[in-house]
C-alpha cells in the first residue's frame, strides 16, 4: 500500500471534478459541506475549506475506497 501525500482541499476538489471521476455537487449542498455525486460511484461528503490540507489517508480513502479507483490510478491522478 502506497503512502499518499497530503494535498490542499482546493486541489482535491479539482481532482474529484475532473475526468475520469466527474463528481458534481448535488443541489442540497450547504456551506462548506459538499455532497459530491458521480454516476456509478459512491457519493462523497466533502468538507471544503480551500486552504486546509487533507491528510494522505483521507486522500486515499476518497479516491480508492469511495471513488473506486485502483491505487495506481489514484496515484497517477495526484501526480
Identify what each model region corresponds to.
Residues 29-33:
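Short acidic/glycine-enriched loop/turn segments that link adjacent beta-strands
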Residues 6, 14-15, 34, 61-64:
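General helical structural elements
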Residues 52-79:
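C-terminal structural segments of small proteins and small subunits
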Residues 41-45:
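Short, charged/polar, Gly/Pro-enriched secondary-structure boundary elements
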Residues 5, 51-52:
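Short amphipathic alpha-helix initiation/capping segments at coil-to-helix junctions
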Residues 36-40:
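Active-site beta-strand termini and strand-to-loop segments that position acidic
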Residues 1-28:
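N-terminal first-folded block
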